[in-house]
Every structure is written in C-alpha cells, then in structure tokens.
From Swiss-Prot:
SMART domains: WHEP-TRS (SM00991)
Sequence motif 'KMSKS' region, location on chain: 593-597
PTM sites of type Phosphothreonine: 833
Organism of provenance: Bos taurus
Residues given in the record as ATP binding sites: 596
Entry protein name: Methionine--tRNA ligase, cytoplasmic
Motif ('HIGH' region): 273-283
Recorded name of the encoding gene: MARS1
Keywords: Aminoacyl-tRNA synthetase, ATP-binding, Cytoplasm, Ligase, Nucleotide-binding, Nucleus, Phosphoprotein, Protein biosynthesis, RNA-binding, tRNA-binding
Length: 898
C-alpha cells in the first residue's frame, strides 16, 4: 500500500494518525506530494490524501482511508461512530473550512474565526460531558475520535480557539494530542509552523459561502444526535412519576448562617468594589452578578450558603475623591456606600450581608494578622524612594500620581498600575509624573516602609496551590496569572503607605502610616463577616468544612491568589483559603471602554432610568458574560436577544403552555397519558437539566443559561408538532392527546421557572405565581425533571412575561450613552443601525419558518383568529429583519374599505 499525503493539507492529519495506529499490520509506504499533484488518474482535480491499495484501487476520502486503517488494526464498526463520521462530513467540515479560510487566508481573528465552529464545538463538548465518557463513542478511542481530532487540530492547537469553558472538549482534545501517532502526524503536516502551514493549500480552495446563520444561530438541536438508552428513559419516567414527594425537605432558615458539620458549606464573596466609583455594567457582571447567580443556585441545591460583599473604603482613591468633592473621606464613604447598596438592590443581588471596611473589626483583624506575620519574621523594613509633592507638602501615594506608563507608553497610567497594559508599576517608574492634586512635578525622596516577604512565603503558597488547583474550578485566566507570578519569582511587596485614611500600622516608628489597600482589602471579607456575626471564625478559620468561592475580574487575581493566601499562611492561624477562584475577562462597551467622565456606557445608577427591567439587564449581561475572552455590551445585540431569545422563545413557550391550560381546561392541569415520544421528551429534558447542573457546579454560568433556552426550544417544538389547539376540537382521543401535551408543556414551564431563578429572579417568581407552583418546588431544583403540577392542579392568571424592545427606543438609549462617540457614529438609511450577519441570517430563517406556518394555516382554512395571530407574528419578524438590515420600514398601505 502507498499513502500519499501533502504538507499543509489538513486532511493528511487524521490519516497519518490512523496509519500510525495500524503500524505493523501491513506494509505501508508514505509519500509526500505537492497539493496540485494528480495521484488518482480518473479524478478531474488533484486530491490528497490518497491511499493506493495493493489491488491498485484508490481510497481518497479522509474518513474512508482512516476507516481502512482502523479495520486493519482489528477495530469493529458501530453505529455511533458512523453517526459521528456523517456529522463530521456534513456539519463540522463546512464550518471548519470557513473558519480556517477566515483565519489563514483572510487574516481574521477572534469571534470571526470561532463563530462558524462554536456550535459544533459546543455539541462535541455537550455530548462528551453528558455521556461521561472520555471518547466520542465510549470508553476507548475510536475512528470517530481520530477523524474529528485531525479535522479540529489545525484550529484548536492554538489555545485561544479552544474555549476553556468547554471542559470536556478541552480534556478530549488534549488526551488525543498527547498520543504519539497524533504528535507525529502534526509534525509531518504542520512542520512546526502551526496553522500557517495550511496557507498554500487553503489559498487554492474556493472561498467558503457564508455559514454563520446555519451553523451558529441559536443552539444545536442535540436530540437529533443523542441516542437514548432504554435505561435512561426508564429512569427519567420513574423520576417524573414520583413528583413532589421525591423532593428533599427544605433547609430550615438560619440567622446568622453558620457552617454545619457534615453539610456542604459554601462561602461566596464578590470582589469588594471601591466605594468612590459608581460601578458600570462590566464591574457588575464581573463580580456581584456572577456571584449572585452561583449563590442563588447553591441555595436551590440546598447547600448551606453564605454570600458576602461590601465596599472597599480605605486608601488613596477615597482621599482623592474627597478632595474632588470637598468632603471628608468618611463622608465620601457614607455617600457612595448607599449608592452601591441601592444599585445592587435594584439588580436583585441576594447578599446575605453587604458591609464595608471602615469598621473597628477591620482594624482589629488586619492588625492581628500583621502582628502574627511580624512575629514570624515575614515582615521586612526598607527605605523606599517615593514621589513627594513639595507644593502639597506630602508624599504622594500611588493614586495621587499620574504619568506615562514605562511599559506601553499610555499617557494616563496611575502610580500603581497601568489600565491599558495591566502591568503593575512603582510610582517612581512613571515618565513625566504629575501630582494629581496640583499638577506640579513631584521630586523623589526616601521614606521607611514595611514589606511582606513574599519570597520567604513562596514555598508555602506553591505547596497550597499544588493541593488546591487539581480538581478545583479556578478559571483558566486565574491559573495563568498565578503561574506567571510564581514563574517570574515573588518579590517583597510594600504593605504600608504615607496616608491618613486607612488601617493604622501598630508598630513604633510607623504610627503616621496606614496599611496599603493590597494588604488589607482582602482582609475586608473577614471583617465584613465579623460585622455580620461574632462567630465569623467558624467560616474563616475552618478550611476543612468550608468551600470558598471568590468572584472577581482578572485584575484582582494576584491579590486573592497570592497576596492574601501568603498573609494567611504566614499568620499560621488556620485561615480558610480560596477553593475556587472565578475570574472574568473584561466587558467593553460597544467598540470602546466605559468612561464616566466622557459619558460613555451604562453605569449602575443609570440602568434603572432606561425603563428596561433589571431582569432583562441580568439576562443580557449573563448571556454575554466575558468568560473565555473579552466581550462587549451592544445595544443592537441586546434588542435582538430580548426579542428573539426571551420574547419569541422563552416567553412565547411559557405563555402558550399556561394559556392552553386556562383556555382549554378551565385553569386546571389536565390528565396526562404519556406516549413513547413524550417519554423521550422527558428524558431529553432530564439530560439537559443534568447538563445545566454540571455546568453550574463548574461555575460555567453563561453556558448553563443556554441550557434553559434549549429546554424552552424543546417545549416550543413539542407544542408546534402536536398542535393541541387543533386536537382539542377533535374526538376523545385527540382531546386526551391535547391534555397530555398541555400538561407536559406546563410542567416544563414550571421547571424553567426554577432554573431561571439564579438568572432572572423576578421573572422566575412571576411564572411561579402564574402557575401557582407549590412552595417546595419553588425553592429546590432537583437533578431530574419531576411532575410538579399534577392533574387537577389549578393555575392562576397567565399574562405575557416580556415586552418587545423597539428599535427607536434602543437607538435613543444608544445615543444617550455614547458620550462624544455619538457624533461620529456612522448610520445607515434612516439613521438605523445594522445587526451582524449572524443575527440577520437567524431572523431571515425565522421569517421563512413563520411564513410557512401562515401558508399552512391558510391552506387548512384554520380559525381566522389563529391565522391573524400568526400573520401578526410574521409582520413583526419582518419588521425586526428590516431593522436589523438597516432598511427603512415600509408604511403599511392596508386594504381600502369599500
């Protein structure tokens, strides 16, 4: 046999890996040819890879060649593998061809490349995690694994295109990539050039047609590929039939909440926001909103949960703000603490306690940790060269200095950190420094300060991380940042400042100094807990019984992952350290950054004045949560997500399910006689619910939200296929079928109301009130889909959950929050803003689908009111499409009255 491959031809990867697996089973000569060489004489265009058999026949399909090698090695075919191969050819390959073409030939990056394949990657990840198997077809590697690995390798070998949140896919890919046949194949084809090795080959390929709409819109219909076993169906049906009786008893409420031996005790913190800043949407999603979702989920799981946060009130920033506003630091703290609390209250953040750091408990606990570190030799004294403003007659703390960043040249870098490149800075390193108060140029002078001896504590920190990180849910960016700090070597870190507003340093000779915020801000979690309960040590000196989850943006990782653990380990007082450090990337605003001074972006105190409910803000921010990479808030996208995902998908299904109960069955849930198809639906929903649990337990908040929308789509499809509004008018069998469909649908709505609770608590409560969901079912989320609304249950009054966002409303808000960018914003016809091609394609498909529904109803001479309702939906979708395309809306001419 002779195998012809070509360097830079992606199809050569899987066949070489498969050939390596069959090594020694037959004589094989491998020849490298150019991509334009005609190996197969009867093909009209060049094709590689090609396998020439001993018989003289040729195989020139990648999967056929790989199958041949696997059969040689004794592998037996199975249906699931064949299904994966069909899917790879029809769905994955077109998407990958587009992604690789965009990346290699057109030089695109980021979501432009990942977008076409995101749906396919999510499907692979979902399938792997749901089956709980390491490989696609089971416990052992199969032909499907090699073919899909080879197809994906050129793209995913760059870690930035392997989404960290797709954990099962990540593990599968790394397992295969580490195998010797796969490594040799990659070396042969890519020649250590990475994906650029494919350029000569891809440049000769036709430009791919637009695939985004078909491949990315909405979510993959997993049920088309999922193979349900009889056992899975039986388990799902048995759980359904047990209903409410299978729910555990509600946890008794505690006040205060304290750890309980033998239970899962979950302590959750959000990074403490600086009191002097009004939080913008990026601050809210990065810390408090993400933590709130997990806290609400923890309570639904009946875990013993305490969720804390508070304002960080000491430090230079507060003194600076006090000067700007002509107030004392304490007055500034009092004023802005109330602003923060009001904002989080409006966003429905469910803190058990929201405190502050300007308290006696903060002083006591911080000074105690310092004294313990000092006594154990972990505090150093040294002279520091500092900037002093002679005009203001004082040393300038970091935030009182601005200048040019020595690393990236950013002209507005602070004396502690550059907001552009993110690097930490010593104030004296700034170029062209200026006093922030008087704008004069400061001089360099010496001052005695205290340092935390991080090098001396490094071994303890590394030992702790080695025990903590495996099996934990630290996000990838948090792991990377911590490893970078350790790799570069820890350095002594100054923990004092020449300020008045802060925790006093309890050491002779340093009475005129305070602790630096990096040292004592993270101790704020402890003091806030101490203000909540005098038994705070049961949470913070109890590492054996407490799971600590800390939520933050990535710039806070060093202080939570290095500085505080070093202090706590050095204090040797059995402190609870972070078990799971959850860090987000950054949320930008449209095409730029949030800026209060320039009036760009939505800040927390402004959101409530937009007329958009808090739950809609929560939904969109969580849907767009910057998990693996930075994301951006977009008004156009917010309109689209509200009108498509909430109004047309989720809200439409829940409203229809409830209305059918009210309209057809007098408000009482009808009897349900489940068919085999109904039982399969039960099982699909149970599996999706379990996937939701798996995701949230791993704190993959954004992906779990998509599970809710997937279940809602299942429900909409179920209603559309079974047409209960028609069956209710038929004979006894049809009416019974209408009852079953309606009863099952309204129970799906009840399940969704509980799954929604962490994300949209007000909407969740509204649904539960409309359905009159029994109290235990409102507060507990089981792992199986249960019948919580049995036959005979009476529901309440059903009404729509969501309102449509209009384009003129959103355009007005966009202009309002655009600051100086408003004048420069390019506009399309009639001043409208276009949506992205993915959204336009999705709307085009919805218009086509709805048009078919209208034509079908007219052909069947259905009820006029029903036709009118569907026509109204069609017109509304057409309007959304026109707005998305930036076209002026046509004025309806209507029919002339006679």
């Amino acid at each position: 046999m002779r195998l012809f491959v070509s360097e830079g031809a992606p199809g050569s990867l899987p066949v070489l890996a498969a050939a390596g697996r069959a090594q020694g089973r037959a004589e094989l000569l491998i020849s490298t040819v150019g991509p334009e060489e005609c190996v197969v004489p009867f093909l009209t265009r060049p094709k590689v890879p090609v396998l020439q058999l001993d018989s003289g026949n040729y195989l020139f399909s990648t999967s056929a060649i790989c199958r041949y090698f696997f059969l040689l090695s004794g592998w037996e075919q199975d249906d699931l593998t064949n299904q994966w191969l069909e899917w790879e050819a029809t769905e994955l390959q077109p998407a990958l061809s587009a992604a690789l073409y965009y990346l290699v030939v057109q030089g695109k990056k980021g979501e432009d490349v990942l977008g076409p394949v995101r749906r396919a990657l999510t499907h692979i990840d979902h399938s792997l995690s749901r089956r709980s198997c390491p490989f696609l077809a089971g416990e052992t590697e199969s032909l499907a694994d090699i073919v899909l690995w080879g197809a994906l390798y050129p793209l995913l070998q760059d870690p930035s295109y392997l989404p960290e949140e797709l954990g099962a896919l990540h593990s599968w890919f790394q397992t295969l990539s580490s195998q010797e046949p796969c490594q040799r194949a990659a070396e042969t084809v890519l020649k250590q050039q990475g994906v650029l090795a494919l350029r000569p080959y891809l440049q000769k390929q036709p430009q791919p047609s637009s695939l985004e709409g078909r491949l990315v819109s909405n979510e993959p219909e997993e049920e088309e590929l999922a193979t349900l076993s009889e056992e899975e169906i039986a388990v799902a049906v048995a759980a359904w039939e047990k209903g409410l009786e299978s729910l555990p008893p509600l946890r008794p409420q505690q006040n205060p909440v304290l750890p309980v031996a033998g239970e899962r005790n979950v302590l959750i913190t959000s990074a403490l926001p600086y009191v002097n800043n009004v939080p913008h949407l990026g601050n809210i999603i990065g810390c408090v909103l993400s933590a709130d979702v997990f806290a609400r989920y923890s309570r639904l799981r009946q875990w013993n949960t305490l969720y804390l946060c508070g304002t960080d009130e000491y430090g230079t920033a507060t003194e600076t703000k006090a000067m700007e506003e002509g107030l004392t630091p304490q007055e500034i703290c009092d004023k802005y603490h109330v602003i923060h609390a009001d904002i989080y209250r409006w966003f429905n953040i469910s803190f058990d306690f929201f405190g502050r750091t300007t308290t006696p408990q903060q002083t006591k606990i911080t000074q105690d940790i310092f004294q313990r570190l000092l006594a154990r030799g972990f505090v150093l004294q040294d002279t520091v060269e500092q900037l002093r403003c002679e005009h203001c007659a004082r040393f300038l703390a970091d935030r009182f200095v601005e200048g040019v960043c020595p690393f990236c040249g950013y002209e507005e870098a602070r004396g502690d950190q550059c907001d552009k490149c993110g690097k930490l800075i010593n104030a004296i390193e700034l170029k062209k420094p200026q006093c922030k108060v008087c704008r004069s140029c400061p001089v360099v002078k010496s001052s005695q300060h205290l340092f935390l001896d991080l090098p001396k504590l490094a071994a303890r920190v590394e030992e702790w991380l080695e025990k903590t990180l495996p099996g934990s849910d630290w996000t990838a960016n948090a792991r990377f940042i911590i490893r970078s700090w350790l790799r570069d070597g820890l350095k002594p870190r100054c923990i004092t400042r020449d300020l008045k507003w802060g925790t006093p340093v309890p050491l002779e000779g340093f009475e005129d100094k305070v602790f630096y915020v990096w040292f004592d801000a993270t101790i704020g979690y402890l003091s806030i807990t101490a203000n909540y309960t005098d038994q705070w040590e049961k949470w913070w000196k109890n590492p054996e019984q407490v799971n600590l989850y800390q939520f933050m943006a990535k710039d806070n990782v060093p202080f939570h992952g290095i500085v505080f653990p070093s202090s706590a380990l050095g204090a040797e007082d059995n402190y609870t350290l972070v078990s799971h450090l959850i860090a987000t990337e950054y949320l930008n605003y449209e095409d730029g950054k949030f800026s209060k001074s320039r009036g760009v972006g939505v800040f927390g105190d402004m959101a409530q004045d937009t007329g958009i409910p808090a739950d809609i803000w929560r939904f969109y921010l969580l849907y767009n949560r910057p998990e693996g990479q930075d994301s951006a808030f977009s008004w156009t996208d917010m309109l689209f997500k509200n009108n498509s995902e909430l109004l047309n998908n989720l809200g439409n299904f829940i409203n229809r399910a409830g209305m059918f109960v009210s309209k057809f069955f007098g408000g009482f849930v009808p009897e349900m006689v489940l068919t085999s198809d109904d039982q399969r639906l039960l099982t699909h929903i149970t599996l999706e619910l379990q996937h939701y649990h798996q995701l949230l337990e791993k704190v993959r908040i954004r992906d779990a939200l998509r599970s809710i929308l997937t279940i809602s789509r299942h429900g909409n499809q179920y209603i559309q296929v079974n047409e209960p509004w028609k069956r209710i008018k038929g004979g006894e069998a049809d009416r019974q079928r209408a009852g079953t469909v309606t009863g099952l649908a309204v129970n799906i709505a009840a399940l969704l109301s509980v799954m929604l609770q962490p994300y949209m608590p007000t909407v969740s409560a509204t649904i539960q009130a409309q359905l009159q969901l029994p109290p235990p079912a409102c507060s507990i989320l089981p792992t199986n889909f249960l019948c919580t609304l049995p036959a005979g249950h009476q529901i309440g009054t059903v009404s729509p959950l969501f309102q449509k966002l209009e384009n003129d409303q959103i355009e007005s808000l966009k202009q309002r929050f655009s600051g100086g960018q408003a004048k420069a914003s390019p506009k399309t016809a009639a001043g409208l803003t276009t949506a992205g091609p993915q959204q336009i394609q999705a709307l085009t498909e919805e218009v086509t689908k709805q048009g078919n529904i209208v034509r079908e109803l007219k052909a069947q001479k259905a009820d006029k009111n029903q036709i009118a309702a569907e026509v109204a939906k069609l017109l509304d979708l057409k309007k959304q499409l026109a707005l998305a395309e930036g076209k002026p809306l046509e004025t309806s001419k209507g029919k002339k009255k006679k």
